């Protein structure tokens, strides 16, 4: 059972950190009022090229009821740093587990083969 090895426990710890960091990032954004794609809650704070600066086009582009609340890449907050660090830890853990499985499989096949 490769889940019981140290690499598996690192993967489980990384998943727990990621699960804890997810709600923290969402609550930090809601507290800061970051609701639209440009990183602010107000209308007409920033306009994309080609977009009109009137409220009618803003309402068509952005609705607070059906918009996703993802991580803004332009605003560096502590919550997004924690999220991306935990995401990197999960990726490293997955690569380590896959490498460990492939290495053990190769080692077992070489030992079991007859020369």
From Swiss-Prot:
Q: Give me the Intravirion side stretches, as residue ranges.
A: 99-115
Task: Give the location in the cell.
Answer: Virion membrane; Host membrane; Host Golgi apparatus, Host trans-Golgi network
- Its main localization is virion
- Which keywords label this protein? Disulfide bond, Host Golgi apparatus, Host membrane, Membrane, Signal, Transmembrane, Transmembrane helix, Viral envelope protein, Virion
What start and end residues bound the annotated signal peptide? Answer: 1-27
Output the superkingdom of the source species.
Viruses
Sequence intervals crossing the membrane? 78-98
Which membrane topology describes this protein? Answer: Single-pass type I membrane protein
**Alphabetical list of InterPro entries matching this protein:** GN_domain, HSV_GN
One GO cellular component assignment for this chain's record is: viral envelope
Q: Which residue intervals are topologically Virion surface?
A: 28-77
Q: Which family does it belong to?
A: Belongs to the herpesviridae glycoprotein N family.
Q: What does this protein do?
A: Envelope glycoprotein necessary for proper maturation of gM and modulation of its membrane fusion activity. Also plays a critical role in virion morphogenesis.
Query: How does this chain assemble?
Result: Interacts (via N-terminus) with gM (via N-terminus). The gM-gN heterodimer forms the gCII complex.
Name by which UniProt lists this protein: Envelope glycoprotein N
